[in-house]
Each structure stands twice: as C-alpha cells, then as structure tokens.
Amino acid sequence: TMAYQNYDVTVGGGAPGTTGGDQNGSNSVFDTITSAGGGGGKGSDGAGGSGGGGSRDSSPGGVGNSPPVSPPQGSNGGTGIFAAPQYGGGGGGGAGGNGSNGNSSSGGPGGPGTSNSITGSAVTRGGGGGGGTFAGPSGGNGGPGGGGGQSTAGTANTGAGGGASV
C-alpha cells in the first residue's frame, strides 16, 4: 500500500546506437526504486553496452543485469557476425530474454519483454531492439514488448529498445 504523498520520479533517457565506447541509457527512479538504463548498441566494432546488441564485426552483445541486482534487470544482447552479404548485428536484450545473434543474411531479433497488469490489463513491455545490418535492409525485428525494428524507435512508454540503423 502506498501512502498519499509526493514521490520523486525520474524517467531515464534511452541509450544511443554508437560507434565509440559503451553508452548506456540513464536510470529511471521512483522514490527509492532505481531501474538501470538500457545498453547502447555498436555501430562498427565492439560489444554493446549492458544488454545492447553487438556490432557486425563478430562482437559480443552487452551483458544484461549490469551491475548485478536482484531481481535481475535486463538480459544479454546478441552477438554480431562478420559474414557477407548482410553482416548482421546482434539484437538487444529484452526485459524477459536475451537478444538473438545476427547472421549473414539479417540482424538478430531483439529479446522479448515481460508482461504485467499494472494498468488493469496485461501489457508486454521492455522488448529489445532489433540488430541492424551493414550491407542491406534486412535488420532484425524488435522483441515483443515494443522493441523497434531496424532504424525504428521503440514504442513510447514501454521501456523498449530501438532498432539499430544501417
């Protein structure tokens, strides 16, 4: 039961896709509860941030739930692959499961979100973003729960990841 009073709420910003170092999204805070921001994906080389997908250069996805907390927050991102013709990047991890690896023909799909009924009916939120491709339009689909496909933002107010761009 919650007391009738003012509560501090901070809505964290999303993580960017990046070609440089790991750049995670900022944390969200409700009173004394903090939820870690999602991990950024990679553009050309290197691992993604916490839960972000890996690049096309056979780089691993970021590790979810980092730093580790209980209950866990987020899942691992998929691994990218350096293989023609598409050089698929890994999908981002979702709240309910890991992102999938990329392959030679497409980016990996994002991991699934999780369902809850906080609004009175079951809604799935927190899907991972789809992995992009280097040489074509065959990006991975966003994970169930609002994850965006290639070059598409995650669905607003779902905590979902956006898809990587080409």
Put a short name on every predicted segment.
Residues 1-166:
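Low-complexity, glycine/proline-biased repetitive segments and flexible coils/loops
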